[in-house]
A protein has these predicted regions:
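Non-Sec secretion/translocation targeting segments of pathogen effectors
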Residues: 1-5
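Amphipathic alpha-helical segments in structured regions that serve as interaction surfaces
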Residues: 14, 22-32, 42-56, 64-68
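Amphipathic alpha-helical segments that form the core helices of the histone-fold
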Residues: 25-28, 32-34, 49-52, 101-110, ...
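Charged, low-complexity interaction regions
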Residues: 35-40, 57-59, 93
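Accessory alpha-helical DNA-binding modules that contact the DNA backbone or grooves
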Residues: 53, 69, 96-251, 257-288, ...
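Patatin-like phospholipase
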Residues: 67-93
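An acidic, glycine-/histidine-flanked metal-binding catalytic module
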Residues: 265, 284-387
């Protein structure tokens, strides 16, 4: 087996050793999969490959091996990128079954934390069928799919327009196609009468909602909201996502709330939302349920931003903050670790092999139950240091 499409240039101490190291790495990766599979941990696979490489090349450093590892992992991302494009085509083409097939395959591959080396190997994942496996082989061999490369320009332009329309909050594939078929070709063409009330909100704030939110804006928002909620009393709050992980910006704001008293007062979540509206924090409602709210908030400098507010049970605080903090890769690693222990981890909690929820209410308790130390949010990239 040869994984033949070109890897990017990588830095090795001696340039002439590049080809030898890469070939040895590839041989060892294939050999390792005779013992391990795609469900194994990154640490297991990487350590096995490293030991195999060192049998022939003694002066190779761990960092050099990890650098090549990351390039092979990038192939997984290339597979996902191309399958996402195929899924997008099927969505706008109205092919529901093909959309579902690509969606399942993409989800399965996203859960893999080690390099995929063939379509037949990927087919062992639930959701990857024989047709998609053949496409994966072509991607691994060439770095592309001929069917996409040869796509006519008019088809590409149509997809670009549909993608822009689909970025409007509340506009799904069917609405995007309807707008396109009505003759509209950009955001400015769309009249109010072509959209429902929620979609009009999405269009009104389209530009702001496409922008990343600077950390400073969220920090000021957190200060303002905490002051308001403290007046209500008995409320615990946490802004999760990339903000809690210490990153410089975020796509939207995920605010988690929990009532700390023994019994939640009737309609308490509605009261909270009403107060946030009265204080000028929330300016538009997009959707609202018993425990989840989606809307538009306004920053101190008057910029509209997307916000989701989750009102969670006190006993789920640990699992909910763990889930909504991320990162996505960290959550995948945690779920896979739980599966290897015959358990299930979700935003609702950690469950044993019989489906019983374990009485764990903090992140620390959940992580320790999985055999891990408490991991600070800013270190939650993946579990490679701990698995």
């Amino acid at each position: 087996m040869k994984l033949s499409f070109d890897l990017p240039v990588i830095q090795i101490n001696k340039k002439e050793e590049l080809s030898t190291l890469r070939e040895r790495f590839e041989f060892c990766l294939i050999e390792t999969y005779n013992t391990y599979d795609l469900f194994s941990s990154k640490t297991q696979i990487l350590e096995s490959v490293k030991a195999c490489v060192e049998e022939e090349l003694n002066d190779v450093s761990k960092s050099e091996i990890e650098e090549i590892w990351n390039l092979y992992i990038a192939r997984n991302n290339k597979i996902i990128e191309i399958l996402e494009e195929l899924k997008e085509e099927s969505v706008y083409g109205g092919n529901r079954f093909r959309t579902q097939a690509y969606g399942k395959a993409i989800s399965a591959i996203k859960n893999v934390r080690v390099p995929i080396i063939s379509g037949s190997q990927a087919q062992k994942l639930k959701g990857v069928g024989s047709k998609i496996a053949k496409k994966i082989d072509e991607i691994l061999e060439t770095g592309e799919l001929r069917s996409l490369v040869q796509k006519p320009d008019e088809v590409r332009k149509r997809i670009d327009v549909l993608r822009e329309f689909g970025a409007i909050w509340g506009v799904g594939p069917k609405t995007a196609v309807r707008l396109y078929d009505a003759g509209y070709r950009n955001i400015d063409d769309i009249p109010d009468k072509a959209l429902n009330s929620k979609q009009k909100i999405g269009l009104t704030y389209y530009k702001n909602l496409q922008e990343r939110i600077p950390r400073k804006q969220i920090t000021l928002f957190e200060k303002d909201v905490r002051k308001i909620l403290n007046e209500l009393g008995n409320l615990k709050m946490c802004i999760c996502g990339s903000y809690r992980r210490g990153l410089p910006d975020s796509g939207d704001i995920d605010l988690l709330l929990a009532y700390e008293g023994s019994r939640v007062p009737q309609n308490y979540f509605k009261r909270i939302l009403k107060v946030l509206h009265e204080k000028g924090i929330l300016i538009e409602d997009l959707s609202q349920g018993a425990e989840i709210y989606s809307g538009i908030m306004k920053t101190r400098d008057g910029i509209a931003r997307r916000i989701d507010i989750h009102f969670v049970p006190k006993r789920e605080w640990g699992s909910q903050t763990l889930y909504f903090t991320g990162s996505k890769e960290f959550n995948i690693d945690l779920r896979n670790l739980a599966i290897r222990q015959n358990r299930k981890l979700s935003d609702k909690g950690l469950f044993d092999e019989k489906g019983n929820r374990l009485p764990l209410s903090t992140e620390k308790e959940i992580l320790e139950a999985l055999g891990l130390p408490y991991i600070k949010p800013q270190n939650r990239t993946d579990l490679s240091k701990w698995s």
